[in-house]
């Protein structure tokens, strides 16, 4: 199953990449939403090898996922690999400079089930695809608006 969303942001690509690679902020957001997040690496800067172990509730079950940054190409691309029981996934984060002060963010998530229960989970996600796409688009748009606002205040 593949999900894709894109959003244009009124800020330079370097600024947007800094925001999208601010992993500590994303960790705090996950913690506020009830997830348990443990950083597995000892790196003090973003880069290949940054990894997390995340536990969260989803569809009535406790899920655990390990995520690792496997490609890091500032300021244009990051690729994350994820593994959970019965499923693997990849999240690609790509940035494209549209102008000096405008950047396009493209997020692509691919989930690959490896057993029957994971297939059933992915199938249920496919059935709710419209709602999931809409929710993802709203979240990304809200995040992008926040980045734009912070950039505008800074300039």
Please identify what each model-predicted range represents:
Residues 13, 45, 70-75, 94-104:
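A short, structured loop/turn motif at beta-sheet edges
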Residues 1-45:
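Hydrophobic ligand-binding cavity/cleft-lining segments
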Residues 38-85, 138-155:
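Glycine-rich portal/gate segments that line the openings of hydrophobic small-molecule binding cavities
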Residues 1-8, 102, 137, 141, ...:
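Hydrophobic-ligand-binding modules of eukaryotic lipid transfer/binding families
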Residues 81-134:
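Beta-strand/loop substructures that line and gate deep hydrophobic ligand-binding cavities in soluble
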Residues 4-10, 55, 68, 94:
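Generic structural detector for well-ordered beta-strands
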Residues 2-4, 62-67, 87-92:
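Short, surface-exposed coil-to-beta transition loops
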